[in-house]
């Protein structure tokens, strides 16, 4: 079992590495309800509270699985228990054409960017499996050396920053 103090210390170090000492007033965490994003929610809520940073929570319900609404409701309840405002954004635009995972990812980023307002940073959690999957998908697509990587710790998306403290 991972030591919670070490986990919190490691998270704080990752955040400092990404943000430096100029901390934002407002941040958000994108939470799907999966283990990676729920862990991120708890860590980010604690980290932000200790630094007087206003934290909000956003969930994108892609409505592709029957249980997705229940997962969004669970995230809302946990967020409220932590004293954090929560918003669920629904994606209804899948037309059945093309690459579903890519369309869902793009929709998630677009919806979050449309929602975020003055929030400068949105944290997103990813597991090691997500990292490996991203690397393998890029390899399969024939990415060159520059394109062969996992998910970058910081993404600049539409003039906003989307951060992944799991690096």
Per-range role (PLM):
Residues 1-167:
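Core alpha/beta nucleotide-donor-binding catalytic domains of modification enzymes
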């Amino acid at each position: 079992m991972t030591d919670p103090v070490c986990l919190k210390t490691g998270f704080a170090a990752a955040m400092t590495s990404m943000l430096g000492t100029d901390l934002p007033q407002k941040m958000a965490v994108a939470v799907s309800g999966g283990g990676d994003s729920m862990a991120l929610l708890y860590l980010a809520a604690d980290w932000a509270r200790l630094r007087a940073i206003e934290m909000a929570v956003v969930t994108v319900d892609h409505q592709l699985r029957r249980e997705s609404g229940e997962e969004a409701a669970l995230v809302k309840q946990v967020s409220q228990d932590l004293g954090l405002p929560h918003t669920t954004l629904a994606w209804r635009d899948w037309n059945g054409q093309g690459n579903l995972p890519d369309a869902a990812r793009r929709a998630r980023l677009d919806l979050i960017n449309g929602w975020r307002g003055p929030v400068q940073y949105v944290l997103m959690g990813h597991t090691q499996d997500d990292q490996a999957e991203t690397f393998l998908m890029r390899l399969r697509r024939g990415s060159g050396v520059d394109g062969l990587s996992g998910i970058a710790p910081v993404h600049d998306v539409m003039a906003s920053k989307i951060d992944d403290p799991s690096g």
